[in-house]
Amino acid sequence: MGIKGLTKLIADNAHGAVKEQKFENYFGRKIAIDASMSIYQFLIVVGRSGSELLTNDAGEVTSHLQGMFNRTIRVLEAGLKPVYVFDGQPPDLKKRELAKRFARREDAAEDLVTAKETGNEADVEKYSKKTVKVTKQHNEDCRKLLRLMGVPVVEAPSEAEAECASLCKAEKVFAVASEDMDSLTYGSTRFLRHLMEPTSRKLPVLEFDIAKVLEGLGLNMDQFVDLCILCGCDYCDTIRGIGPQTALKMIRQHGSLEIVLENLNKDRYQVPDPWPYQEARRLFKEPLVTPPEKVPEFKWTAPDTEGLRQLLVEENGFNNDRVMKAIEKLKVAKNKASQGRLESFFGVSSSSSNKRKEAPDSEASAGKQVKTAAAVKPAKAASKKGPAKGGKKK
């Protein structure tokens, strides 16, 4: 779910905090990518026709493999250095949200049956997408694929967004890429949206700078966390009647959730019971993550050609010629990515360059500040096209 209404709130109140960037501006940069979010996007869009998805001969869905394979090659071709971070065990406080998602999928499944009976194709596609769930098998398939591609994989002990933010704060990566805005709530210094969007949509990457977000909103980090909780997050329901703008006004006026609650008009606003905002705050400020010093050095290695062919062609029915051509593209892309950014030739380490609060001049000049909420929209799709296709419609 992320943080309700946060994208528009930032666009309306902290214009300088968001810049439009070209995909290629991140050449040589290490980017932590929320793997589960990417897989979800691929399952929603890749190879989909109504309620049908790409499958192998055993009837197992392969859309996630095709999407991950093709998009990762595209990322590497642009010279980026992706690090995919996978979710671990969710916090207990998230169980209520997960239960709600399960119920929504169940409702969507019933609506899907009705849509199929009435022959309404638009509703069939709509409700089919709402039934999508990223499974353990989907995650395992993609972990295996990425390792065969020679791309680093991180397994978070809990929330992937928190692990990504920790890597970013520790300067292990330059930025975090996801579509969930709670990456900012966890403290990511740089946050990217639309990085995994298909090239065909021609959407710029949106780069959020947390320091400028705080400056624009007039809050410190503790107050920003409280704002996100008040807006509505995975750990706490919203308070009916309090939208993002009202939440910002209240936090600016009172400074903390405790004082907001003390001064809240109880006749007008009903606080959910329970409303565990203190535990939610703790999870955002002190999440369960791998200590940065224990994270191994990231390495991008040569792809395992035979392993990829076995997984994609033999096990999942991908076209052999397309896969082999894609692997050649992957090898070329790996060589390009290994060149690194220009500063590396002058002895500047990646961690040193990350300490700058703003992007290099070449990137800043290419970036374009986002000034309207309309320019900041959530991603809706993953790539439909790529160098390798496999499977058949389910």
Curated annotation (Swiss-Prot):
It comes from the Eukaryota. It is found in: Nucleus, Nucleolus; Nucleus, Nucleoplasm; Mitochondrion. InterPro entries: 5-3_exonuclease, 5-3_exonuclease_C_sf, Flap_endonuc, HhH2, PIN-like_dom_sf, XPG-I_dom, XPG/Rad2, XPG_CS. Residues 123-254 are annotated as: I-domain. Mg(2+) 2 binds at D180, D182, D234. It is an enzyme of class 3 (hydrolase). Residues 382-394 have a biased composition (Basic residues). Keywords: DNA damage, DNA repair, DNA replication, Endonuclease, Exonuclease, Hydrolase, Magnesium, Metal-binding, Mitochondrion, Nuclease, Nucleus, Phosphoprotein. This is Flap endonuclease 1-A. SMART domains: 53EXOc, HhH2, XPGI, XPGN. Gene3D superfamilies: 5' to 3' exonuclease, C-terminal subdomain (1.10.150.20), 5'-nuclease (3.40.50.1010). Belongs to the XPG/RAD2 endonuclease family. FEN1 subfamily. Residues 338-346 are annotated as: Interaction with PCNA. The gene is FEN1-A. Mg(2+) 1 binds at D34, D87, E159, E161.
